[in-house]
Every structure is written in C-alpha cells, then in structure tokens.
Amino acid sequence: MNILRCRIENYRGFENADVLPRGHVLLVGEPRSGRSDLLAALGKVFEVDLTRLDERDFFRGDTSRDICIEVTLGDLGVELEQRFLDELEFWDPDARSLIPGSDELGDIPPDAVAVLRLAFRGRWDDVDERGDQTIYWTKRSDPASDNLRRVRREDRQAFAFHRLPGGRPLNLAPRGLLRSALSESEAEALTVALEEMRNGIDRLSGELALALPVIGALAATIDVLRPYLETDAPTPDVVRFLPDEGSLSGLLRALSPALDLGDGVGFLPLSRHGSTTHAQISMAEAIATSRHDHAVVVVDDFADSLDTASAQRLASLLRRACGQVWLSTRRPEVARGFEQPELIRLTRGNAPGQRHVHYGSIPTTRAQRVAARELHRQILPAMTARAVLVVEGPHDAAAHGALAERREEIDGTLPPEAHGIRIIDGGGQGGIDQAARLAEMSRSLGFRVVTLVDYDRDEAEAASRLAALQAAADVVVRLPRGMAIEAAILDDLPDADVISALGDVGATYLLPLSAGWETLTGNDLRREAMRALKSNNGLHAQFIQTLPGMLPTMACSALDTAVGCCRGVSATAFVQL
C-alpha cells in the first residue's frame, strides 16, 4: 500500500496543499513550514480511534470553514481491492491524476491502477464547542450536501498505516506498535500469557502479605482500623500488594523493556541506556513490524537522537521494509538512503501562513549531474535554511564565513546563519558556471537563492555568465570589475595590518613570500598577499581571522548586500557593487 496523493484544506498551517509523492517520501523543510502538520494530516485519515479536534487545528483558527484531508491510496493488493470493490477508482500513473468516469471499464487505459480515496472532514460545532470528525469514502460522497459514506472503524483497521508514536518502544499495551503487528492468534496467545502473569503476581502478592517482616506491621495497622472496617478477617485477606491499580492495563503500564547489551551490567531499563539506544530500538521495532503488511509508515523528526551511521542505516532499512515510508527529518545523512525524486521540501511563502511544496528530481543533463554532486555535501545540510548564498568556490565560502564571525565579534553584526541563511559554494572546481548550476538546483527545492560572484574582465563573457546567473537565481550580486575574492578581502586595509596578518599566518603555514616582502607597500604588497593567500589550498579565512584592526571594506559591503538580498530587504534582481 502507498499514498499517491494527499490534499489538505484548512488544516493547521495549511490553507490549501496538494502533495504528490514519487514513491517513498523524505520530508524536509525550513522551520514552521509544516512537516509535522503534513504527517499529522495523514494520521487523521487513518485514525482508528479518533483523537481530539480543537479550534487550533483549523487554519488560522477559522472554525467556519471545514477541514478536508483527502488521501488517494494505490498498490492495494488483492485483499483490499476485493474488500472495498464498490469504492475502487482508477489512477493514471503518467498524468498522476484520477481518471474521471472510471466506472466505465472500456475507458480505462491499460496502465491504470486501482485506487481508493478516503477523506477526513473536521467541522466545528459551535453549540457543543467541540470538533465533529468524519472519515468517509470520497467516491460516492457529497460533502456539499452532507451526504457522506462513512468508513467504519473495522474498515479503517484494515489499512496498514503506522504512525510511529513518540512513546516508549516495545510497548505491549493494546495501542503499542509491537502489539498492533501481532496476528489474531498471536494476540490471543499474548492475552493468555498476560493473564497468567497477572495471576502469578496476585499469588506472589499474597505470599508477600504473609511474609514475617511484613505481617507484623500490617497486622498492627489493620488492628487500629478494625472497628471502622468491621471485619475480623485475617490481615492477609484484607491487604494485598498489586502493581498500579491491579488491573491488566495497569500492569502493562508498569512493564517496561530492559536490555542486556553485553557490557557486564546485566538487564537495564531501556530508559537507562540513553537516547541513542532508545531511538535505535524504536526504529528497529518499526522496521520489524512493517515487514508483515507492507505498511505505510510515518515517522516525524526521524533520527534526532541517532548517531550519523545509525541514522543512515536505519533509514535505508525502513525504506526497504515498508510499502511506503514518510520520514520527516533535520538530519542530512538520512537522505543517503533515498532517491533524489523522493525528496519533498516544504517552505513558507511570503504571505503569513502560506506554505509551498517542492520536489527533488532526477538530473537529466551533464550540468545537472555535476550540480547534483553537491546535494549531499552542501544543499541537504542547508535543508532547514530559508535562503542560500551561493559563491563561486570554497575559498569564497571560507572567506565570507570568517568575515561574518569577525564582524559579530567586533561590532555585533549578525552572521548569515542568524537570519536562516547558509553559504554554499560551487565545489572544488568552482567558477561562475558551477555557481549557476548550484543556484538552479537550490531554487528548484524552494530556497531563496542569491549568488555573489566575481566580475570577469572579458565583457562579452561576463555578460553571458550574468544572464545564466540571473536565470538561475533570485538575485545576483557582483563584485567590481576585475575584482576577485582575494582583492575584496584586502580592500582598504592599512599596509601595516596586511603585513601583521601575513606574518601571523606565515608562522603556522609555509607562505611563498618573496624576500623582503615586509618592505612592500600599496599595490605591490597586495599582489604579494594575493599570491600567498592562494597557496596551501587557500588561506583566506586564516588571514581574516588574524587581521589586527579594521576589516576589508569591499568584502564587508558585498556580504551585507548579499545577506540583505537573501532576507528580501532589497527587491532588486541584480546588484553591481
């Protein structure tokens, strides 16, 4: 089973959204873009026991408009198709849309797939001040006339949908994930075993009440109360010790898994093993239980407590085990277990409450494949950023990063990260052409993209590259003609500061400086400095970090301008410094 489409109206932060996954889903996005809301919306359609609906679940608290969440399910299997034969419709996998009039079998294309549509309607009752919730079949329902064909509770149980709860793993309670994966015969056997455990505890509690260290104190206590209790029964018949209420549900609440991991300390409660082990067990449980029914598994904030290797490995296993997995994450290494088209990124629009959906895609050209190499190295680590500042190469990125740190130390100017901006570069080869490719990919994933580049001396070539950049990015910021990053970070610096910083850098790194370089001044000194900064794979950041006084004027101006454009402070599409 897998979800082919999810349409949301007026639910939490979504006024209107249409999500069309391509197989499994890796859900990423900037803060407050709706990752958790989207997964919660899926859960509402498949809830067996409906959870509470309140005013805050309605878009902007407007309870006059109904919540509508519609899900289209494919890859149903024979059992679901036969059980819900009257509700079947057909889906065009190429157009990724429902085929209208699909009851006419002669009009159905040969590659069409059978689907079911289920929907959730949330309506606010002003009289009782509560939310009224209905899950219904879309095919033969008419919400406008309030004619809804409800999906019965037992029918909702037929759908293999698991939303991984935030509670403890290996939970034997009826709503626990482990318990839900049991077959009918296994569930009956577990019930018998739990009853035997409870009876055994009852027997042991009776023996405890008869134990010599206890009986005396209990008898003395009960003797004080006998006139009020009006009983002459022996003390063990009056007092027993039972775990948490004495009921089976209370017993299950008191039970928690304990693990012996072979480290010599024996069995320890899972909570004592730390957050990483807890998260590993939770994910392993989800993988094991989803294998039985090719389920749709939904996990929010996946891998927040996992180490890097476990995050990547468990994400890959979960993807292989499930019919379809929806993972929401902030961890970039999780993406290594997914295909690029399975990436969905949510962003916030400019208007309050506006949200957008963006999709990863398969690179089809050589230029796109080259840019895709930076997906895992730079773009996915920036997945939670609102904007990216694309520079030509690693030297540019290092220089601007160091400059931002120094400015915050000196005058409190906030760095790009404080505004939700990440600096990324064109990779090892770098260059304006690669920056344009990277900008195009970033923009397709919903980032606001600003590029900060050099101005080539060849005017015709500069014009051609500028046009490519403007087509790929939201804003292009260009340094003065003929100025590269090395010249920008030396701009307006006193000769004494340049000599001091080069001397400090040279104390750690072997710089190719000419004999007597300390006596150089003006342009001669700057040419020597630029040659030295390009050595040792670039020492731009180290130079900026050791500057004793003022910072370079042009580099600061360029960074300020680019950050302002990332924030949308400047509406212009091109800035020539």
Where do the PLM segments sit?
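Conserved beta-strand position immediately N-terminal to the Walker
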Residues: H24-L26, H162, V388
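RecA-like P-loop NTPase motor core
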Residues: E333-R336, P341-V450, Y455
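Switch/communication elements of ASCE P-loop NTPase nucleotide-binding domains
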Residues: M1-L27, P31-E47, L53, P257-P381, ...
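Activity-critical C-terminal alpha-helical subdomain
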Residues: D454-G538
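Flexible phosphate/Mg2+-sensing switch loops adjacent to catalytic phosphate-binding sites
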Residues: V45-I69, A351-G353, G412-H419
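Extended helical coiled-coil dimerization/tether regions that scaffold
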Residues: S183-I281, E285-V296
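Glycine-rich phosphate-binding loops of NTPases
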Residues: L53-G61, V78-R198, F267-L268, A471-A472
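Charge-patterned, long linear interaction tracts outside catalytic cores
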Residues: R226-E230, F241-D244, S249-S256, H400-E405, ...
